[in-house]
Amino acid sequence: MENTQENPASQSAEENGSETQAAQDAAPAAEAADAALAEAQAKVAELQESYLRAKAETENVRRRAQEDVAKAHKFAIESFAEHLLPVLDSLEAAVGDTSGDIAKVREGVELTLRQLTSALEKGRVVAINPVGEKFDPHRHQAISMVPADQEPNTVVTVLQKGYTIADRVLRPALVTVAQPK
């Protein structure tokens, strides 16, 4: 019978040699893994910083937009008010006039009306004067129906003008409408 057992000392030396070889082989891999980890951590830090900058910029844009909207609301009427100042000046001059000349007062009132109409038009306020138009319940308010030679549901007279601002009705025109025959 042959002895197939190896010497325990030689077996231990072989294991130590293979472990040393494995450790030597693992060292470059560990260094590469450490380098990859460090690179990934640096990338994460960079992305976090970019995220925080983008978030701060977004907040600044949102805040500026809110401030712009607040200013727009606050000063929206400024231009309109500037156009009304000449009307105010004319009315104050008329009140201060003590001449008693009716023709002069009438001329001043007509001028003031033209100034007011101009100021309203600059503010995009437009009169609705729909005589002869088809009745539109969105723009007109019928006060009565009257017999007329016009087509039924046509505006016959305007009792009070209506007004729109940028195609939105501020006040509907008060009208009488032709009765169906």
UniProtKB/Swiss-Prot annotation:
GO terms for cellular component: cytosol. It comes from the Bacteria. Its main location: cytoplasm. One of its GO terms (biological process) is protein folding. Residues 21-39 have a biased composition (Low complexity). Residues 1-39 are annotated as: Disordered. Pfam families: GrpE. It is found in: Cytoplasm. Residues 1-20 have a biased composition (Polar residues). CDD domains: GrpE (cd00446). InterPro entries: GrpE (IPR000740), GrpE_coiled_coil (IPR013805), GrpE_head (IPR009012). PROSITE patterns: GRPE. One of its GO terms (molecular function) is protein homodimerization activity. Keywords: Chaperone, Cytoplasm, Stress response. Participates actively in the response to hyperosmotic and heat shock by preventing the aggregation of stress-denatured proteins, in association with DnaK and GrpE. It is the nucleotide exchange factor for DnaK and may function as a thermosensor. Unfolded proteins bind initially to DnaJ; upon interaction with the DnaJ-bound protein, DnaK hydrolyzes its bound ATP, resulting in the formation of a stable complex. GrpE releases ADP from DnaK; ATP binding to DnaK triggers the release of the substrate protein, thus completing the reaction cycle. Belongs to the GrpE family. Homodimer. HAMAP family: GrpE. This is Protein GrpE. It comes from Burkholderia multivorans (strain ATCC 17616 / 249).
